[in-house]
Amino acid sequence: MLRSAPLALGLEPHPLNNSLAFPVFYHIHCYCPSPLLLSLLLHYTVLFSPFGARNHKLYIYIYIYIYIYIYMCINVCTYMNAGPRGVCSLCVYVCTHFNIYIHTYIYLLFVY
């Protein structure tokens, strides 16, 4: 009962040292988002951002980064025989770092 309590609270083992970490940026099953979904998200931020189209180079870099991430995430999960929604530690690690970057980017975009 007590051993399952952290999981009930939303805590997961950290992929590197197996300690519990609060998954603020973790996917539940390490989803690999589709390019269409991410493209729609970025087009939305371009259309409604306070910066407008002035920083179009920034958006191009973000696009490139996202597609590299998708390629890496799908290949890693397939290589680990976990499938695109598998819970392999390396895939979770990649997804976690991507989530930190994209959430930070969106936060900075709408705050500054």
Swiss-Prot record:
<dbReference type="GO" id="GO:0016020">
    <property type="term" value="C:membrane"/>
</dbReference>
<keyword id="KW-0472">Membrane</keyword>
<feature type="transmembrane region" description="Helical">
    <location>
        <begin position="33"/>
        <end position="53"/>
    </location>
</feature>
<protein>
    <recommendedName>
        <fullName>Putative uncharacterized protein YIL100C-A</fullName>
    </recommendedName>
</protein>
<keyword id="KW-0812">Transmembrane</keyword>
<keyword id="KW-1133">Transmembrane helix</keyword>
<feature type="transmembrane region" description="Helical">
    <location>
        <begin position="58"/>
        <end position="78"/>
    </location>
</feature>
<feature type="transmembrane region" description="Helical">
    <location>
        <begin position="91"/>
        <end position="111"/>
    </location>
</feature>
